[in-house]
Design a protein with these regions (language model features):
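Hydrophobic alpha-helical segments of membrane proteins, primarily the transmembrane helices
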Residues: 40-47, 128, 132, 136-139, ...
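Hydrophobic alpha-helical transmembrane segments
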Residues: 39-43, 87, 91, 127-131, ...
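Membrane-embedded alpha-helical segments that form the functional core of polytopic membrane enzymes
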Residues: 121-142, 146, 205
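Hydrophobic alpha-helical transmembrane segments of multi-pass integral membrane proteins
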Residues: 43-54, 91-106, 132-134, 182-189
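Long, highly hydrophobic alpha-helical transmembrane signal-anchor segments
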Residues: 2, 6-42, 90-126
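N-terminal helical submodule of small eukaryotic multi-pass membrane proteins
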Residues: 60-111
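Cytosolic/stromal cytosol-facing helical appendages immediately following the last transmembrane segment
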Residues: 1-39, 58-67, 71-80, 151-280
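Transmembrane alpha-helix/helix-exit interface in multi-pass inner-membrane proteins
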Residues: 98, 102-110, 134-155
Length: 280
């Protein structure tokens, strides 16, 4: 909650003119409780989850032949009913699991120092912080995901996510409620170690969500912007993990592939790629 009642008051305290973004933020957030600002995160996740996978899903339903050559597993269709069931279950999980978690974790958010006031962070500051969050989340998520593929972790929790042997964007957050809670820890770990402004926190969560949807889209498009990010896994890389399914001990990477390479959990994938290359 901002304690300034007007732009002139804020400028007097900060001893400078507010930027356009800061003035807009003041008008929006002044008098708004920090809990409600933090709760925006679940709203953003629902909007992104609904809209981000939609164009590709519509294209796959209306013009499948136009993009079939880019589909990683072209012979295994995903029905509309399965996608709708997935969407319904994920929305329920967001509202019944992630939503309450947002409220319960609010004291922790305040304790670690995620702020809502002025000044707003610079673009360089926001970029550096998100960069740290990516690295921290990627490493921590690798081990959580790998633990989910132990016999107990898979049987009790992770098998739900692997119901989709052919990934689709809408299935990115499709998982057991306990897995949603566990995977929230790596995502929050970066902001806990390097506290940020709430707007950067929103940005990080949205980017992470979009990345997960892209990774699960099931299509390997040649000119996707993420193709130019070094060590980025992407859809084709993660698709192999779902293709193998229950027995998969490969490609646990969340975003980048370096952990799989360092710890030797990409050997099956590399063998699979080499075999496909020889067949072609």
């Amino acid at each position: 909650m901002l304690h300034y009642r007007s732009v002139p008051e804020a400028e007097a305290v900060l001893q400078r003119n507010l930027t356009t973004a800061e003035a807009a933020w003041l008008r929006y957030s002044a008098g708004t409780h920090d809990l409600w600002l933090y709760f925006h995160n679940i709203i953003f996740l629902l909007v992104v989850y609904t809209l981000a996978p939609l164009p590709l899903a519509v294209l796959e339903l209306t013009r499948p032949d136009a993009i079939r050559r880019y589909k990683v597993q072209p012979k295994v269709p995903v029905s509309l009913s399965a996608v709708l069931r997935c969407y319904r279950n994920v929305v329920c999980s967001f509202l019944l699991t992630v939503g309450p978690l947002q409220i319960l974790s609010y004291p922790t958010v305040k304790w670690v120092g995620i702020r809502t006031g002025l000044p707003l962070p610079t673009w360089w500051e926001a970029t550096a912080q998100v960069g740290v969050y990516v690295v921290v989340e990627d490493y921590a998520n690798y081990w959580v995901h790998r633990a989910m593929h132990t016999p107990w972790g898979y049987e009790k929790i992770h098998h739900v996510h692997h119901e989709f042997t052919v990934p689709v964007g809408f299935a990115a957050p499709y998982a057991h409620w306990a897995e949603l809670l566990l995977l929230g820890v790596p995502s929050f770990l970066g902001p806990a170690l390097v506290p940020c402004h709430i707007t950067v926190f929103w940005l990080w969560m949205v980017l992470r969500h979009v990345e997960a949807i892209e990774t699960h889209c099931g299509y390997d498009f040649p000119h996707t912007p993420t193709k130019y990010i070094p060590f980025y896994g992407g859809a084709e890389y993660h698709d192999y993990h779902h293709f193998v399914g229950r027995q998969s001990q490969s490609n646990f990477a969340s975003i980048f592939t370096y952990c799989d390479y360092i710890y030797g959990t990409d050997k099956g994938y590399r063998y699979h790629k080499d075999l496909r290359a020889k067949i072609r």
